Amino acid sequence: MQKDYQKLIVYLCDFLEKEVQKKGFKKVVYGLSGGLDSAVVGVLCQKVFKENAHALLMPSSASMPENKTDALSLCKKFSISYTEYSIAPYDAIFGSHFKDASLTRKGNFCARLRMAFLYDYSLKSDSLVIGTSNKSERMLGYGTLFGDLACAINPIGELFKTEVYELARRLNIPKKILNKPPSADLFVGQSDEKDLGYPYSVIDPLLKDIEALFKNKPIDTETLTQLGYDEILVKNITSRIQKNAFKLELPTIAQKFNPK
């Protein structure tokens, strides 16, 4: 069913206002990378909280300079308050101590550094941390646990990446941000498509069918291939979903021990 994106904007703004108020906060903070998802969240937060919304720009030593430029341009266009904290000195220390660390380890370390900066700012300013992960990323587990997935509330967590693009157009996000390849900007040359093997335009229809057909049920790959999806695509995507499902769950806590 086609979404009414203007109504969606009103709904998400209402969600942000009510949930932040419900948790006893007046101010919010979020990470702004220069990418699409954080730009959308930033503009939504600015609409609702105005001067009580604040963005943190946290480039690493591997961040592309144009991403910072795009983030600053967004801040200027929408009058977004921001602070820049470079995490480059800290990821350099990690690199010097763990010279054999894989790109994934380095990327996860940077994501968790950013989380630490966000929550430190949250405490200092009495602000609530707002998440920027979309539904495609969440279903695929394409994020860092206690890193970029960490937040108090997330306005776009139920929107697939292709839907975030449509929402961004309605919010007048700059075309430079809209048109660049999605990337977590965790290491040089990284892109979502390289990591996932497919563009979101291919992945999202499959994710939508998986959610519609197999919610709270085991995924039947044969059913999906019968719908016309490529067998390798189905195998790769379902494998990711199953392997990373734990990232969407709260920690499992042992029940209270009652000796008989």
Swiss-Prot record:
The EC number on file is 6.3.1.5
Q: Could you tell me which pathway this protein works in? A: Cofactor biosynthesis; NAD(+) biosynthesis; NAD(+) from deamido-NAD(+) (ammonia route): step 1/1
Q: Where does Mg(2+) bind?
A: 37, 137
One short Pfam family name for this protein?
NAD_synthase
| Residue positions binding deamido-NAD(+) | 112
Q: Where does ATP bind?
A: 31-38, 132, 161, 183
Alphabetical GO biological process terms: NAD biosynthetic process
The alphabetical list of record keywords is: ATP-binding, Ligase, Magnesium, Metal-binding, NAD, Nucleotide-binding
Gene Ontology annotations for the cellular component aspect, listed alphabetically: cytoplasm
Q: Which GO terms describe its molecular function?
A: ATP binding; glutaminase activity; metal ion binding; NAD+ synthase (glutamine-hydrolyzing) activity; NAD+ synthase activity
Is the Magnesium keyword given for this protein? yes
Q: Which reaction does it catalyse?
A: deamido-NAD(+) + NH4(+) + ATP = AMP + diphosphate + NAD(+) + H(+)
What is the protein's quaternary organization?
Answer: Homodimer.
Q: Which family does it belong to?
A: Belongs to the NAD synthetase family.
Function in brief: Catalyzes the ATP-dependent amidation of deamido-NAD to form NAD. Uses ammonia as a nitrogen source.
NCBIfam families in the record: nadE, PRK13980.1
Q: By what name is this protein known?
A: NH(3)-dependent NAD(+) synthetase
